[in-house]
Amino acid sequence: MNERAEEEELRRKLRLIRLLHQTNPYPQGPGTASQRRNRRRRWKQRWRQLVALADKIYTFPDPPADSPLEQTIQHLQGLTIQELPDPPTNLPESSESIDSSQRLAEI
């Protein structure tokens, strides 16, 4: 199963690289010599960029299967929301509100 997954990942990368190469066809068409030369020069520059990008795609390492992020996601997916009890209707006055009112009186 692991070899099959690796093979499928390699095929996906190769399809992406092939798509990149198909988006940059060799320039065709009429024009003066300088226009044709400039089109070829721009095409060659784009081609070098595509080759560099394809190399990065091909050599980019795959993330490990049990990365901390995936473990965290699996843990979060296991969480459920439980029904909480109704809050109490009469709350005692908190000590923080007493402290803040005493401080205001001192100022």
UniProtKB/Swiss-Prot annotation:
Keyword annotations of the record: AIDS, Host cytoplasm, Host nucleus, mRNA transport, RNA-binding, Transport
InterPro entries xref list: REV_protein
Pfam families: REV
Residues making up the signal peptide according to the UniProt record: none
Coiled coil residues, start to end: none
Subcellular location: Host nucleus, Host nucleolus; Host cytoplasm
Residue span of region Homomultimerization: 16-24
Residue ranges of the region described as Disordered: 20-40, 82-107
Motif (Nuclear localization signal and RNA-binding (RRE)): 35-49
Protein origin, superkingdom: Viruses
GO biological process: mRNA transport
Any one Gene Ontology cellular component term annotated for this protein: host cell cytoplasm
Disulfide cysteine pairs (residue numbers): none
Protein role: Escorts unspliced or incompletely spliced viral pre-mRNAs (late transcripts) out of the nucleus of infected cells. These pre-mRNAs carry a recognition sequence called Rev responsive element (RRE) located in the env gene, that is not present in fully spliced viral mRNAs (early transcripts). This function is essential since most viral proteins are translated from unspliced or partially spliced pre-mRNAs which cannot exit the nucleus by the pathway used by fully processed cellular mRNAs.
Entry remark concerning the domains of this protein: The RNA-binding motif binds to the RRE, a stem-and-loop structure present in incompletely spliced viral pre-mRNAs. This region also contains the NLS which mediates nuclear localization. These overlapping functions prevent Rev bound to RRE from undesirable return to the nucleus. When Rev binds the RRE, the NLS becomes masked while the NES remains accessible.
Protein name, UniProt field: Protein Rev
Native species: Human immunodeficiency virus type 2 subtype A (isolate ST)
Lineage: Viruses, Riboviria, Pararnavirae, Artverviricota, Revtraviricetes
